[in-house]
């Protein structure tokens, strides 16, 4: 009763995506590309921007909040229990692809940046409060 019915939608894929076998550039986390496409379709980045605050300014901002949250959440989805693998995942082709375009060449965040994000930035009162509408926003779009 009163439930919103969503029409089925089709995911589109990044045109830069290539499937090839090169031993030094293999990833076991390619399934996250589908999650990233879903995240884009649901508008996660916009929802994060609306509800989480970032006090960083200028050159201190190498990664957006959305990139940091994606890397943190996606690494857990891929089975990495903590931040110990962040340095290795920074160079992983999938973790580069799921971030914003500036990460594609540079690589994802390292352990120290993710640790700061999870223990300092994300735990600020305004962001703890903001996580509730982020969750509701994503669920509401699904």
Regions found by a protein language model. Give the residues of each.
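Dynamic "connector" segments at or just before major functional cores
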Residues: 1-142
């Amino acid at each position: 009763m009163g439930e919103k019915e969503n029409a089925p939608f089709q995911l589109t894929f990044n045109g830069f995506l290539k499937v090839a076998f090169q031993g030094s550039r293999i990833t076991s986390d390619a399934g996250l590309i589908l999650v990233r496409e879903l995240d884009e379709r649901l508008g996660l980045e916009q929802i994060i921007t609306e509800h989480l605050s970032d006090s960083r300014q200028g050159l201190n901002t190498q990664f957006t909040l959305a990139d940091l949250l994606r890397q943190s959440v996606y690494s857990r989805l891929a089975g990495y229990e903590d931040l110990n693998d962040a340095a290795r995942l920074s160079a992983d082709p999938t973790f580069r692809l799921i971030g914003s375009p500036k990460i594609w060449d540079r690589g994802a965040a390292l352990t120290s940046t993710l640790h700061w994000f999870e223990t300092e930035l994300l735990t600020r009162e305004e962001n703890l409060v903001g996580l509730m509408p982020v969750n509701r926003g994503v669920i509401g779009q699904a």
